[in-house]
């Protein structure tokens, strides 16, 4: 076997991961932890793709709590010349190094035995689909525990290198309320202050709101901030104390009145869509942290939909893992 190192650099910030195959059993026994629900229709789409290609063509984005020795091994390996080095059309630099020395591979395997858990950062649907394809193939013919379908393609990144961006919300209407009624209602749970210019939240439990060509700062009142790992997330606070009770958004996964915009597109995208009349109000979020993500996964809980937006995205097609 060989490993690869995969580095992505975006806007001067680099993240360096190890490309490996991870075991479907470690997902099933919760050593590889999730923080999101998946949808059956999206899973099926990816199951069909993996089955038809007989391969994983896009890696799952996994993370782990930093281990100094692993960092040191990888730092030494990237002193060598990469086998790939290119800039994609989205201006992300991608570099790949090959690790084919047995002693280095064995060292990494031994060090990862000390890592208690891996966490899915991005790719919950692809991860669930890879596992289901493996289980399906186990049921067909004689089971071979070394067969490639028992494993799926992943890149493992140390948590301190990852960058979660804000994942912002747009709502089509004010649920039958006038602007004044809406502003009155939200002041029950939030301190509302009109601000000059765009407002990007700079601390947890604060939100930017764009309505009728004006920006507001919303500060959640202490009385609505829950103490559990999921309830205290800003996405939960906004959902439970504003989107559901005031705007009537029940299930954000299925409600057609809400849309989500990754922070990579900036606040200008929110302004554009509200000013065009397509949407009525926008909410700019403070990003979820890696610590929050891992705490929720460790508690065996799930985050609300659209809680995290990771950049840069891992590129499909650089690495391919054939299942047979």
Feature names for model-found ranges:
Residues 1-324:
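Surface-exposed, charge/polar-rich loops and edge strands
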């Amino acid at each position: 076997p060989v490993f690869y190192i995969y580095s992505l650099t975006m806007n001067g910030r680099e993240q360096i991961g190890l490309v490996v195959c991870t075991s479907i059993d470690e997902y099933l026994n919760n050593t590889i932890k999730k923080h999101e629900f998946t949808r059956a229709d999206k899973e099926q789409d990816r199951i069909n793709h993996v089955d038809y290609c007989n391969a994983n063509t896009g890696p799952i984005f996994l993370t782990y709590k930093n281990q100094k020795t692993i960092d040191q091994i990888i730092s030494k390996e990237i002193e060598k010349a990469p086998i790939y080095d290119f800039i994609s059309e989205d201006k992300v630099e991608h570099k790949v190094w090959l690790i084919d020395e047995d002693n280095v591979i064995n060292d990494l395997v031994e060090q990862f035995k000390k890592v208690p858990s891996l966490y899915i950062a991005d790719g919950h649907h692809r991860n669930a689909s890879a596992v289901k394809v493996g289980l399906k193939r186990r049921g067909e013919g004689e089971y071979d525990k070394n067969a490639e379908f028992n494993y799926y393609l992943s890149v493992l990144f140390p948590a301190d290198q990852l960058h979660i961006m804000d994942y912002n919300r747009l709502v089509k209407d004010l649920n039958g309320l006038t602007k004044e009624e809406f502003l009155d209602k939200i002041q029950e749970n939030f301190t509302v202050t009109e601000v000059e210019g765009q407002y990007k939240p700079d601390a947890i439990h604060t939100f930017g709101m764009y309505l009728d060509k004006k920006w507001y700062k919303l500060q959640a009142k202490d009385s609505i901030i829950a103490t559990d790992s999921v309830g205290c997330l800003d996405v939960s606070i906004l959902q439970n104390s504003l989107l559901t009770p005031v705007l009537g958004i029940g299930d954000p996964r299925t409600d057609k009145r809400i849309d989500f915009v990754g922070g990579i597109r900036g606040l200008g995208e929110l302004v554009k869509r509200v000013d065009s009349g397509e949407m009525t109000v926008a909410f700019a979020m403070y990003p979820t942290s890696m610590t929050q993500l891992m705490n929720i996964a460790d508690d065996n809980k799930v985050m609300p939909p659209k809680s995290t937006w990771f950049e840069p995205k891992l590129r499909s097609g650089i690495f391919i893992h054939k299942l047979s």
